[in-house]
Swiss-Prot record:
InterPro entries: NDK-like_dom, NDK-like_dom_sf, Nucleoside_diP_kinase, Nucleoside_diP_kinase_AS. It catalyses: a 2'-deoxyribonucleoside 5'-diphosphate + ATP = a 2'-deoxyribonucleoside 5'-triphosphate + ADP; a ribonucleoside 5'-diphosphate + ATP = a ribonucleoside 5'-triphosphate + ADP. This is Nucleoside diphosphate kinase. It is an enzyme of class 2 (transferase). It comes from Pseudomonas fluorescens (strain Pf0-1). It is found in: Cytoplasm.
């Protein structure tokens, strides 16, 4: 398997619950390394740009409002098969459908306030990492 990088957001609901460390520990315990991390408050423009692919969908306004409702942690994770591994750790988008022991099953409130975001492909990971991090901000460990 190849070493990959993936992008992760710990969303406002999880930051508000003070579970940043618990979520990051799950990534690390699964063999993923944090190679870049920022705690930040997204502006409306940043959230709209990041989620532009959903701009025509009915939930777009609510998504932007939620993602700007409090600070988030944006991270780059690195490891073997990082994209699939992160998605497995996160669990299903709807926490009611997420397997026990996944991040969303344990920390998410709803399908909207679902604790984390993770890239779903190599192309998405590259785009999402570049959206929030300059190449010089991502390290190798």
């Amino acid at each position: 398997m190849a070493v990959q990088r993936t992008f992760s957001i710990i969303k406002p609901d999880a930051v508000a619950k003070n579970v940043i460390g618990k979520i990051t520990t799950r990534f690390e315990d699964a063999g993923l390394r944090v190679v870049a991390s920022k705690l930040k408050q997204l502006s409306k423009a940043e959230a709209e740009g990041f989620y532009a692919e959903h701009s025509a969908r009915g939930f777009f306004g609510e998504l932007v409002a939620f993602m700007t409702s409090g600070p988030v942690v944006v991270q780059v994770l690195e490891g073997e098969n990082a994209i699939a591994r992160n998605r497995e750790l996160m669990g299903a988008t709807n926490p009611k459908e997420a397997a026990p022991g996944t991040i969303r099953a344990d920390f998410a409130e709803s399908i909207d306030a679902n604790a984390v975001h993770g890239s779903d492909s190599e192309a998405a990971a590259a785009r999402e990492i570049a959206y929030f991090f300059a190449a010089t901000e991502v390290t190798t460990r």
